[in-house]
From Swiss-Prot:
GO biological-process terms attached to the record: diaminopimelate biosynthetic process; lysine biosynthetic process via diaminopimelate
Pfam families per the UniProt record, alphabetical: DapB_C, DapB_N
Protein name in the entry: 4-hydroxy-tetrahydrodipicolinate reductase
Gene Ontology cellular component list: cytosol
InterPro entries named in the record: DapB_C, DapB_N, DapB_N_CS, DHDPR_bac, NAD(P)-bd_dom_sf
Family: Belongs to the DapB family.
GO molecular function, one term: oxidoreductase activity, acting on CH or CH2 groups, NAD or NADP as acceptor
Binding site for NAD(+): 10-15, 36, 99-101, 123-126
């Protein structure tokens, strides 16, 4: 069986390294390119020196040449970089797995438009467990009667630049949709000072940043006399890497369209 040629954007970052390590462990995948931005100190070094995997792929900033020999680009970078890579992938017909978070509504529209020509998986979290969490939240939000206050608490490492996390926002979207609410109108991002009593229809978000926390997410449904907490805790980035590569395999059966991990895992 011919292995899939996988290019990795942001290859020297925490997620990039985890993805390259996971590719090296798979018989049906091959690292075709390790990509970074111009000026990155690791350019021209062998990617294997960063991951302890077999040598053979030099870290490059030449996206056009690298992607010409790739089936799929896996991208966990920043919105501006991802959109630049998206334009190149669209031109070359290369599929994309996008784990980047922090996109504006307008930027998401650009991705949707590109999906008319190439197949894309866009997901704020590639973990199997987190995507099962989304389904559990939908069930809980529909089943619980009125009178349960909803709070979402997330924690990540000190280097994460966006808040709340894309996963936390997706949790809020799932709950709001299940209860026929508009998240933009009911979301409360942090509280400070004399806030007054809590409005019953709001969904609160709390953010923690510190240390090397990979990712913790909790949805709290607080009623009178009881509370329900649904939590996911990631202990290794390998779980996100494995999910991203599962998404890459899924994309090889699609020519175009925008998908998420619910599609990949058959949960929809």
């Amino acid at each position: 069986m011919t292995p899939l040629n996988i290019a990795v954007a942001g290859s020297t970052g925490r997620m990039g390294r985890a993805i390259m390590e996971t590719i090296a462990e798979a018989d049906d995948l091959r690292l075709s390119a390790a990509l970074e931005q111009p000026g990155n100190p690791y350019l021209s070094q062998d990617a294997g020196s960063l991951t302890g995997t077999p040598p053979g792929v030099a870290i490059s900033s030449d996206y056009v040449s690298a992607l010409a020999g790739s089936d799929i680009l896996v991208d966990f970078t920043r919105p501006a970089g991802t959109l630049s890579h998206l334009a190149t992938c669209r031109k070359l017909g290369v599929r994309m797995v996008i784990g980047t978070t922090g996109f504006s509504p307008e930027e998401k529209d650009i991705i949707r438009n590109a999906a008319q020509d190439i197949a894309i998986v866009l997901a704020p979290n590639m973990s199997v467990g987190v995507n099962l969490l989304f389904r559990l939240l939908e069930v809980a939000a529909k089943a619980l009667p009125e009178g349960y206050d909803v709070e979402i608490i997330e924690a990540h490492h000190r280097h994460k630049v966006d808040a709340p996390s894309g996963t936390a926002l997706r949790m809020g979207e799932v709950i709001a949709q299940a209860q026929s609410r508009d998240l933009e109108k009911v979301a409360i991002y942090g509280r400070e000072g004399n806030t007054g009593e809590r409005r019953a229809d709001t969904i609160g978000f709390s953010t923690i940043r510190g240390g090397d926390i990979v990712g913790d997410h909790t949805a709290l449904f607080a009623g009178i006399g009881e509370r329900l907490e649904i939590t996911h805790k990631a202990s290794s980035r390998k779980t996100f890497a494995a999910g991203a590569l599962h998404a890459a395999r899924f994309l090889m059966t699609r020519k175009s369209g925008l998908f998420d991990m619910q599609d990949v895992l058959g949960l929809r």
